Amino acid sequence: MAIHEWPEGERPREKLLALGASALSDAELLAIFLRVGVKGRSAVDLARDLLLAFGGLRPLLEADLARFCAEHGLGEAKYVQLQASLELSRRHLGSLLERGAALTSPTLVRRFLTSQLRHLPHEAFAALFLDTQHRVIRFETLSKGTLDSASVYPREVSRRALALNAGALIFAHNHPSGVAEPSDADRRITQRLSDALGLFDIRVLDHFVVGDGEVVSFAERGWL
């Protein structure tokens, strides 16, 4: 049955307008993005097929061009639209943490850092530099490593923090393996960074480890 033949309350577009995007399933949201299905399959049917083929929403969203276009019903035009949508989402979150914005929402910080790091195939270590009033100065990626390591030097981080006149930092790095549980090495480098920055009265407020669908906070664990 085509979507236009469904009861109005069950159609993805009408459902979104009535209840908001958060009320829709992954398949329904993807169906709106796809707009149309293929012969014998509605857009929602196709969306469900694609989620099954990719193994979920995240692998679909992070697929490269070749993998994306290998599925029936997708192509370069859809890939371009998807990449543009994802980048708009990242930039929207980034705009909420522009220079001078005060950090009033831990959830927003977590979402922003996740959007910047979770999709990366390599490990990256980043920092959010803040002034003494915890207003954003700058977000920077400090190092990029292999799939299992990233080099971070406390002396260089301290020098950068002083150059930006930062009063506090929030660190974040991703685990491409998808497991967000911090390693012993993660805890050691965080302590070294905290000790080095503490010599200049610069506080480390938190360190987030970003995994697949999970983010671990050092502050929430009582490690900072």
Swiss-Prot record:
Tagged with keyword Metal-binding: yes
Domain MPN: 102-224
InterPro entries: MPN, RadC_JAB, RuvA_2-like, UPF0758, UPF0758_CS, UPF0758_N
Residues involved in Zn(2+) binding: 173, 175, 186
A Gene Ontology biological process term: proteolysis
Keywords in alphabetical order: Hydrolase, Metal-binding, Metalloprotease, Protease, Zinc
Gene3D superfamilies on file: Cytidine Deaminase, domain 2
One GO MF term: metal ion binding
Pfam families, alphabetized: RadC, UPF0758_N
Motif (JAMM motif): 173-186
The keyword Metal-binding belongs to this UniProt entry's keyword annotation: yes
PANTHER family: DNA REPAIR PROTEIN RADC (PTHR30471), UPF0758 PROTEIN YEES-RELATED (PTHR30471:SF3)
NCBIfam families, per the entry: PRK00024.1 (NF000642), radc (TIGR00608)
Entry similarity comment: Belongs to the UPF0758 family.
Official protein name in the record: UPF0758 protein Csal_2972
